[in-house]
Amino acid sequence: MESLASLYKNHIATLQERTRDALARFKLDALLIHSGELFNVFLDDHPYPFKVNPQFKAWVPVTQVPNCWLLVDGVNKPKLWFYLPVDYWHNVEPLPTSFWTEDVEVIALPKADGIGSLLPAARGNIGYIGPVPERALQLGIEASNINPKGVIDYLHYYRSFKTEYELACMREAQKMAVNGHRAAEEAFRSGMSEFDINIAYLTATGHRDTDVPYSNIVALNEHAAVLHYTKLDHQAPEEMRSFLLDAGAEYNGYAADLTRTWSAKSDNDYAQLVKDVNDEQLALIATMKAGVSYVDYHIQFHQRIAKLLRKHQIITDMSEEAMVENDLTGPFMPHGIGHPLGLQVHDVAGFMQDDSGTHLAAPAKYPYLRCTRILQPGMVLTIEPGIYFIESLLAPWREGQFSKHFNWQKIEALKPFGGIRIEDNVVIHENNVENMTRDLKLA
């Protein structure tokens, strides 16, 4: 395998080319990309955890340092002003020397407000990309060039197509997340609480709660029916029935996003349903290829959900086609089949149809689908089907013409298990689909 340094060199060349094209299209001279700043909690002197500007970490794997600036023009070597204060109160990251620093000019910035004297004097034609518009105005950036929509749309669109460097980083993030999932399953099997399972996960991945790309979903029993459950009970339930873990990791700013569901017992209806959802998820991935709309795969999985609802006698006396047509599958899988993945967990440009930002919304029937793109080589997406037993979604179906088709007794028996979700991260290639998650033997 090529070294990360050589992959990064090619990555920078790709970003430079995209930058040249964007600057030419929008008649700008350069982009000033801001890592961000610390923001204090209201009426307090403690800051919120720092989260870096994604457009900044696209260029350099600097994810923990505020007050950094990157100047890029697509021609000259990118110039990074790295915040390096004299500070005995806080940890100060040293000036980086790593695989990537040969391809970027790195300059120490001792004072956060010192960037103004270091930038080119003529700034009227420089675009600012970052979270603090008032800072850009103070630096003399034209208001119309602060987070210009056309430039950002252009860059976002092409972020969908991962470079080999980005894919290498994402495979490393997968390894970390897989280690965490294995540790979490072991903790579940030993009877730990959600809180302690989360600690086991973080320890295995080498992350803190503020390092993971999203808040871990560690859901025992009926908590698995809450799609984004993040409470973390300190006490283990008296009876362990099920465990849904949706948790990721980050490497050089790139995310993994995995979900697994386990049954405490291997010989009940729920355990068989978990196995069947897993099998159908793999079967769907086996059909995926470039040139097909992501929406089609979402719709296809509703047909697979119908098959499982019929097999497990959760819905009875109705064809699978009628279940999908009348949206009886909807309350059981209320979210989309997945989303783009990359520098952000819900990565950008899921609805963009071209580099001008043309938006194609999700179908009205499936409003929570996060991607309507035609799959193309270089895209990375999650595939995360599920079946859940959520009373607020099932309640409207307890009345009306279709109520008789719901096996309410079976549904009540499954509700204490919460739900099921199985999520892998896949890469679209020209002639195949790479399943980064299963390649690491995560069952």
Curated annotation (Swiss-Prot):
Q: Name one Pfam family in it.
A: Peptidase_M24
Q: Which GO terms describe its cellular component?
A: cytosol
Q: Which UniProt keywords apply?
A: Dipeptidase, Hydrolase, Manganese, Metal-binding, Metalloprotease, Protease
Q: Which InterPro entries match?
A: Creatin/AminoP/Spt16_N, Creatinase/aminopeptidase-like, PepQ_N, Pept_M24, Peptidase_M24B_aminopep-P_CS, X-Pro_dipept-like, X_Pro_dipept
Residues where Mn(2+) 2 binds: D246, D257, E423
Q: What does this protein do?
A: Splits dipeptides with a prolyl residue in the C-terminal position and a polar or nonpolar amino acid at the N-terminal position. With much lower efficiency, also catalyzes the stereoselective hydrolysis of a wide variety of organophosphate triesters and organophosphonate diesters. Is able to hydrolyze the organophosphorus insecticide paraoxon and the p-nitrophenyl analogs of the nerve agents GB (sarin), GD (soman), GF, Vx and rVX.
Instruction: Please give the family membership noted in the entry.
Output: Belongs to the peptidase M24B family. Bacterial-type prolidase subfamily.
- According to UniProt, the name of this protein is Xaa-Pro dipeptidase
Encoded by which gene? pepQ
